[in-house]
């Protein structure tokens, strides 16, 4: 899941009154053979530990590879590889007629850590209970991986011939670690994954309120993730002889300045359309404020009022926040070292290095050193100049297909292009010039988002509706009915 992403909730408050629909149907339109296949793939993936600490993405990749070989895919259309033997990625090319450029589907196989003592069930056992599937990865994102595998196998079994190649990449280390699979493939095997555009089931999806579909979100852009290490060093000394030059005080002062700093207000094409749409659904002062921020000259007072909502604030601004702190080495000694981590979510169009330089200006203290920390935990004096590109125009073919499917499966729920305030593997494909969209048919209650958390779970019928959705979507985008 996009790092730090909050599934749903961004549009829910305004839509509840206007777009409530009948509860979800009891069963998705998926035959029993497909249900069994999807169940078995999902169970197999959940029960393969793919955490960074002790797990193996390679084991999951090989399990998928074997299923695809058994379904009749040629080994010549597969690639298994990566930077080390635990982090091998799998790429499959489902060959079409070549009438159109390929579509790339990406799904990460790794999951965040989970401790057995924190859960009521074993996080690495696939448990069915009370209408839910439990297990680490049921929401993030082995559900999406299982759906992609199921879709590929069923299409192959039916002899389906798409009008374009369908490329699917199952990858490592979206959640962290040193070997991000999408980044590695872009840098080392771009020819295997080059496509017109990218669909990432790790974003988007249907927001539910008490079983009723509120909206179908499509992640049309996202923020850039960046960690920065703040360091202050000092000779230290005995605590009975304090001096003003204290490493902790310098660091604390810098963090207080960050606390009171607001990055500039910015809207892009996606967020402008989002807030403009939202203004027609809200009422009173909130509606007026939403209209005011989408004008050619946005109203500063309206921006300030709307920024009190953390989700809207994050969509309007780059945000940086202190997330970790450590200092000192003894209770009776002046600190020789004070460190903090500042986590930033950066609006499209700005680079990691640009924000590092901005932090230096905010802190305004030469004793505070600001370094960039990559996903592997490695620290660098300078950050990459990589930036999340401004969102391209929405793909009309894709949006039309999603609109039609949503109208049929969740009548009345609007399709809402959004900006994810987190970051996913789409950041790498977007940067490589392949427009990337978070698209999912999974429906989750807005108050039951458990990705990365305790007792992660997914409603059983939501999973099978997701299977149904992607099977139909792939056909619609590749020449099928």
Protein language model regions, located:
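N-terminal secretory signal peptides that target proteins for export/translocation
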Residues: 1-7
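Bacterial N-terminal signal peptides
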Residues: 9-23
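Metal-dependent amide/peptide-bond hydrolase catalytic core
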Residues: 29, 204-465, 471, 477-481
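Acidic/His- and Gly-rich active-site-bordering loop/insert found
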Residues: 29-136, 155-164, 342
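Solvent-exposed, acidic/flexible segments
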Residues: 31-39, 50-61, 85, 138-141, ...
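Sec-exported extracytoplasmic/periplasmic mature domains
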Residues: 43-50, 65-74, 150-157, 187-194, ...
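Solvent-exposed loop/turn segments at secondary-structure junctions
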Residues: 51-53, 85, 96-99, 109-113, ...
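Acidic/histidine-rich catalytic neighborhood of metal-dependent amide-processing enzymes
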Residues: 132-133, 139-217
């Amino acid at each position: 899941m996009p790092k730090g992403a909050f599934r749903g909730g961004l549009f829910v408050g305004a839509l509840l009154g206007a777009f409530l629909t009948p509860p979800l149907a009891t069963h998705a339109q998926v035959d029993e053979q497909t249900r069994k296949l999807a169940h078995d793939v999902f169970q197999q993936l959940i029960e393969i530990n793919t955490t960074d600490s002790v797990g193996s993405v390679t084991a999951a990749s090989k399990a998928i590879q074997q299923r695809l070989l058994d379904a009749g895919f040629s080994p010549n259309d597969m690639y298994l590889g990566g930077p080390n033997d635990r982090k091998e990625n799998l790429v499959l090319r489902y060959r079409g007629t070549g009438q159109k450029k390929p579509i790339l589907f990406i799904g990460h196989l790794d999951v965040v850590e989970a401790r057995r003592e924190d859960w009521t069930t074993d996080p690495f056992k696939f448990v069915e209970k009370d209408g839910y599937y439990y297990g680490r990865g049921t929401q993030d994102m082995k559900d999406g991986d299982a759906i992609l595998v199921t879709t590929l196998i069923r299409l192959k079994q039916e002899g389906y011939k798409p009008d374009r190649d369908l490329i699917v990449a199952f990858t490592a280390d979206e959640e962290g670690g040193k070997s991000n699979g999408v980044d590695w493939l872009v840098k080392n095997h771009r020819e295997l994954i080059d496509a017109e555009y990218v669909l990432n089931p790790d974003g988007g999806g249907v927001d539910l309120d008490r079983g009723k579909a509120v909206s179908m979100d499509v992640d049309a852009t996202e923020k850039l993730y960046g960690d920065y290490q703040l360091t202050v060093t000092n000779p230290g000394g005995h605590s009975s002889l304090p001096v003003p030059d204290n490493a902790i005080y310098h660091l604390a002062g810098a963090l207080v300045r960050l606390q009171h700093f607001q990055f500039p207000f910015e809207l892009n094409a996606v967020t402008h359309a989002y807030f403009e749409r939202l203004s027609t659904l809200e009422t009173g002062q909130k509606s007026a404020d939403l209209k005011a921020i989408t004008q050619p000259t946005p109203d500063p007072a309206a921006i300030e009022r709307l920024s009190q909502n953390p989700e809207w604030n994050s969509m309007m601004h780059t945000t940086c926040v202190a997330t970790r702190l450590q200092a000192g080495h003894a209770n009776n000694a002046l600190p020789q070292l004070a460190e903090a981590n500042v986590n930033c979510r950066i609006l499209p169009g700005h680079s990691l290095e640009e924000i590092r330089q901005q932090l230096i200006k905010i802190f305004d203290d030469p004793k505070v050193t600001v370094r960039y920390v990559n996903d592997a935990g490695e620290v660098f004096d300078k950050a990459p100049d990589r930036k999340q590109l401004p969102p391209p125009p929405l793909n009309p073919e894709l949006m039309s297909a999603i609109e039609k499917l949503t109208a049929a499966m969740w009548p009345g729920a609007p399709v809402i292009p959004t900006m994810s305030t987190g970051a996913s593997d789409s950041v790498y494909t977007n940067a490589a010039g392949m427009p990337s969209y978070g698209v999912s048919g999974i429906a989750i209650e807005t108050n039951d988002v458990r990705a990365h958390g305790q007792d992660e779970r997914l409603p059983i019928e939501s999973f099978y509706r997701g299977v149904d959705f992607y099977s139909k979507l792939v056909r619609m985008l590749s020449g099928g009915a």
